[in-house]
């Protein structure tokens, strides 16, 4: 929340009472530090302003220290990598130019509408650099502002580009919060009264783009742990650095990997705000410490498995497990999906000569299913680990017994029947199949009684048993295909 104050020459207090104000605080701190502008942190002053909000830290500053000229200078410095004119000036700093450099300058001019409008009629030939330098310098602020506000990964991703460095707006400038004032606005307020709608827009929201992580990522993040200004700034700095140093496909995967290794700077419940260039709104992920600890426990698990479903979607097991962990969702559906992948590979055997590769993939899938079952049971907190271990052991024993009887085909048959029943949530059928198998091999399954008591709640026992039914004797299994 922004408050006007009268405090020893300072006239403004901004407190991180919501994520927008918190992100603005982080961006402003970077701005003030860049220009070495004096400001104070609320928690660090003994005498507080009269009308501050208790329970929140904040920054105390002079409103006139925020000017458009300084703001654009900061933009140019902070997002230098995306400032096309800076790249051009860097090239023009040379005394001589290669054909490649000449072509690059002309291509860079064409790449931005504002530069094309200023220099499009003049082609760089290596002898007229003075014209290019003077034109850029004379129109520097216009160039910076236009490139920044129209950049899909810059201001435009976060705010309505028409509202950059404006004040007293009727609605908030942020994407997802902004309303077109030229259209009917009665529907946005309570009881169709636009007067009841709180726009809550401040100039300081223009500093929000500086608070989010790595602009080279399609989806960027802001960690709203607003315990104090110091933790806000330091956490987001560390978070952004870790994202930059983390290898992995997909921004969401990077986020999850960074969260796994964030114990040095995230040790309590936090809110993470994300903004994707594909969306016209912000998203929120609330990370509870309890779930974060469980996520960190997964760091030693071998969960890497990807499978192409169609041109637009790849199933990523690691991502699926991590997101369910954070959102406190169980893995039942993921386990069933992995079983379906196993049978898809089985059907591919008929159409492929690479039988050994398919067997290798199937073995990997079953290993992953075993891990998923253990994780699932630990999340549920059910005391059935003894039965899970027993089910896996009996699955291996049954497989060996069937191979001894030269009944390898029965392994696949019973396994498929059990999984088909579980996928259909037909637990009576699953019980029948397991009882039939018990009678066929002449073994009493001690784990089975727990499954009989409550099949829905204890289906992980059946998952574990089915995943352990494998043709362990590869030579025999080859002969029985």
Regions found by a protein language model. Name each.
Residues 178-339, 343:
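Domain-exit/linker segments immediately C-terminal to small folded modules
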Residues 146, 150-184, 189-203:
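Long amphipathic alpha-helical coiled-coil/heptad-repeat bundle
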Residues 103-171:
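A broadly conserved sequence feature marking short terminus-proximal activation segments
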Residues 143-146, 173, 224, 231-232, ...:
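Generic hydrophobic/packing signal
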Residues 1-124, 134, 286-481:
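Long, contiguous all-alpha helical interaction modules
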